[in-house]
Amino acid sequence: MAKNRNLVFFLGVLASFTLSSFPVTVSGEPPILFTFGDSSYDVGNTKFFSSEFDPATTWPYGDSIDDPSGRWSDGHIVPDFVGRLIGHREPIPPVLDPKADLSRGASFAIAGAVVLGSQSTTASMNFGQQISKFLELHKQWTDKERAEAIYMVNIGAEDYLNFAKAHPNANTVEQLTQVAHVLQRIPRELTSLYRAGGARKFAVQNLGPLGCLPIVRQEFKTGENCMEMVNFMVKTHNERLSRLLVAITVPLLYRGFRYSLFDFNGEILRRINEPSLHGYTDTTTSCCGTGSRNAYGCGYSNVHAKLCSYQKSFLFFDGRHNTEKTDEEVANLFYSGDKHVVSPMNIKDLVGKAATDLLAQEI
């Protein structure tokens, strides 16, 4: 059934490209795709990494595609749709799957991933460990393939959610210190990909309004409001991340470094604030779960979680992850949106840029 669903998944893109072809690199082939991040980009690495129970491998996860594959959604997620849009017939596989064909790329993202160290030595890989895993394998692809590849990154949410749980009464200075620590590490890892891995094209998704997640509203009992402390850290993070990416492109040391920065935060807030305009009936409660915001326990057999009757009417599938509908909209904007939502270029334009300076320069 899953194979049939993947065929349907690919055929779906053909209708959207009846008047145009897939974008290709200067070599004439769809670019290889690599993804890094947390559960929002995890396509199944968690189930191979840990022997602990992974709820994303059980129903109702994957309900919309009849395949609970380890994605934290009712169906496909952002990297799946982006991969399809750039011409891949099948979703990019999890790198930890021993049977995976990595010739088209791989997902290094895993649930629970953080930037600052690892909150658990047994249940996740932090951002740096994901980069290290890529560097272990990078000779499987040629210099040219790695230079023309797209490197999708979505990381940092767990750092701020964990901080809020541990320090719910943190003052502004402490919050800004946390942001500074996170943003000291991210550029270091990106430039490691550039120098040692030969990466040139980065597609970075900024952080959504984490304080508005159903699980945060439920756990912190914020009622109809979002948790302002978390959203303040996220807002500061996103503003500084934008400036850091601009700064990386300036020095001659990083010649050929190109990027797309997608305003995920803005798009989610627009949907929360104007649900009917985007076809939603609920943007504050989860489709699957239990509790005041239906935000806890999805996928756990010992929890009497409820499942909504129509996932496409919900923004969130579980307490902190989007529905497939939401992720498809996000991917389409990331791929071909204008500069109000993705800058300085979208992924479609990024793919078409010639990759220069294929070998990283040594200091």
Curated annotation (Swiss-Prot):
A GO biological-process term: lipid catabolic process
Q: What class of enzyme is it?
A: hydrolase
Coiled coil residues, start to end: none
Compartments annotated for it: namely: Secreted
Q: Which residues form the active site?
A: S39, D318, H321
Documented EC number(s): 3.1.1.-
- Which stretch is the leader sequence? 1-28
Provide a GO CC annotation, any one.
plant-type vacuole
Q: Which InterPro entries match?
A: GDSL (IPR001087), GLIP1-5/GLL25 (IPR044552), SGNH_hydro_sf (IPR036514), SGNH_plant_lipase-like (IPR035669)
Q: Which Pfam families match?
A: Lipase_GDSL
Quick one: where is this thing mainly located? secreted
Asked whether the keyword Lipid metabolism is assigned, the reply is yes
> Which superkingdom is the protein from?
Eukaryota
The entry's family comment says: Belongs to the 'GDSL' lipolytic enzyme family.
Under which name does UniProt file this protein?
GDSL esterase/lipase At3g14220
Organism equals Arabidopsis thaliana
